[in-house]
Amino acid sequence: MTDVTVKHIDELESHGGNGRFLFARKGLGVTSFGMNVERFPAGYADYPDHTHEKDGQEEVYFVYEGSATLQAGDESFELMPGTFARVGPGQSRKIVPGENGVSLLALGGKPGSFEANV
């Protein structure tokens, strides 16, 4: 049997049933890193300001539709389609959707698992 899992985004389980957080890692059976699809409309203000200090995970966000502002401490970073942003484990972060909302892929893993230059 081939060790491949293929899912359409519409097949992913939604946290809370509202379609904002989709469990991509769980749906695909990924065990080596975290992965979620996150979709927020304009004006969505409930994205938590948080860190991953306790679990030691850095996160990478990839915006594929819409736009957002990544608030990290006292700094803000504009995220447009095609933009990647990496946030270290201890850094506070919050996603604020742009005027047309945002759809992004969030990846998480523990630093040091891979070489940075590979």
PLM ranges: what are they?
Residues N36-E38, Y61, L105:
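Conserved hydrophobic/aromatic positions in well-ordered beta-strands
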Residues M1-G34, P41, E115-V118:
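A short, N-terminal "cap"/entry segment at the start of jelly-roll beta-barrel domains
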Residues P48, L70-Q71, V87, R93-E99:
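Short beta-strand His + acidic residue motifs that chelate non-heme Fe in jelly-roll/DSBH
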Residues G56-T69, G73:
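Glycine- and acidic-residue-biased ligand/ion/polar-headgroup-sensing regions
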Residues D74-P89:
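Short acidic-glycine-tyrosine-enriched beta hairpin
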Residues N36-D55:
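Conserved short histidine dyad/triad with adjacent acidic residue
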Residues G29-T31, Q71-E75, G98:
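Short strand-coil-strand connectors
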Residues K94-V118:
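Double-stranded beta-helix
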